Swiss-Prot record:
The gene is ectD. Homodimer. This is Ectoine dioxygenase. Belongs to the PhyH family. EctD subfamily. It comes from Bordetella bronchiseptica (strain ATCC BAA-588 / NCTC 13252 / RB50). Its EC number is 1.14.11.55. Pfam families: PhyH (PF05721). The lineage of its organism: Bacteria, Pseudomonadati, Pseudomonadota, Betaproteobacteria, Burkholderiales.
Length: 308
């Protein structure tokens, strides 16, 4: 086991919070492993820690994806599974995990070359699905997701060694300024925020509803935001946001009348598979962090998302 003193990204120890310079590349292999993105797009991702591609999916594709996600949220057999997470204080579905396994069309989505090849290009290797989920924010009552770095959680609770993973968020509804869109801090991916507080056992059972550990301190957050600002990922349904595993992000609650729904695919490099979790923690379930049943994503030969 690597001690906190030897871990470049030690977090949730008895030490105080700290800002630590990133030790890993942002784009691996000079972005030449695949060719889904232009050189300018790769450069933008490397600089900011994220990339918004507008109108990547057609209206027909979006309609099929949204209908499937809505079906899943109404399916009692899915809602009562451990993969379904409800909002704090209600039975409204907040997230459904492992959607690429539970749904054939979402299984094709994770292999769509527009997503998978972009991930392979940025991460410089073959990739597998570390996690997939559908996130819903119903109008008037969708709750916020507080600021966090995914890598902080994946490093501590899942044993992910390095910052060689990314998320892509496929917008299934219009994301506007009022319905709780994703917010990211440009440039924050180059700094790791070490958090305080020992992780409780089975922390995931509460953190997926409301995260209280692995949360960056206000002083560090303010510094990152003053340096980089805050970018709001607004766009039409069918747009996609790719963002680095260490980019600081969050979203406000949705008190507007307009619901928001996104599907997230998390790709991890096949050269960055999980170690045991830190500090003797038990591994999180497979539907949250793929540890056993993983294989390289094989991109579809052509765009076959909607079968006719």
């Amino acid at each position: 086991m690597i001690s906190p003193a030897q871990d470049p990204y030690a977090s949730r120890t008895d030490r105080s919070s700290a800002i630590i310079a990133r030790q890993d590349p942002v784009v691996y292999g000079e972005g030449k492993f695949a060719d889904a993105l232009s050189a300018d797009q790769v450069q933008s991702y490397e600089r900011d820690g994220f990339l918004l591609l507008e109108n990547l999916f057609s209206d027909e594709e979006v309609a099929a994806l949204l209908a499937e996600v809505e079906r899943m949220t109404r399916d009692p057999a899915i809602v009562r599974r451990e993969e379904a997470i409800t909002e704090p204080g209600s039975n409204a579905v907040r997230s459904i995990f492992m959607v690429h396994v539970l749904s054939p069309i979402l299984g094709r989505l994770v292999r769509d070359p527009r997503l998978a090849n972009a991930a392979r290009q940025i991460l410089g290797s073959e990739v597998y699905v570390h996690q997939s989920r559908a996130n819903m924010k119903p109008g008037f009552k969708g709750k916020e997701f507080y600021w966090h770095s995914d890598f902080e959680t994946w490093h501590v609770e899942d044993g992910m060694p390095s910052m060689r993973a990314l998320s892509c968020s496929v917008l299934l509804t219009d994301n506007n300024e009022t319905n709780g869109p994703l917010m990211l801090v440009p440039g924050s991916h180059r700094q790791f925020i070490s958090c305080v507080g020992e992780t409780p056992r089975d922390h995931y059972k509460q953190s997926l509803k409301k995260q209280e550990y692995g949360v960056p301190d206000p002083v560090s957050l303010q510094l990152l935001a003053e340096q980089g600002g805050i970018s709001t990922m607004t766009g039409k349904a069918g747009s996609v946001v790719f963002f680095d595993c260490n980019t600081m992000h969050g979203s406000n609650s949705n008190i507007s009348p307009w619901p928001r729904a996104n599907v997230f695919m998390v790709y991890n490099s096949m050269e960055n598979t999980l170690n045991p979790p830190k500090y003797g923690l038990n591994p999180r379930p497979e539907h949250i962090a793929t540890r056993q049943a993983f294989k390289a994503v094989r991109p579809l030969d052509s765009l076959k998302l909607v079968e006719r």
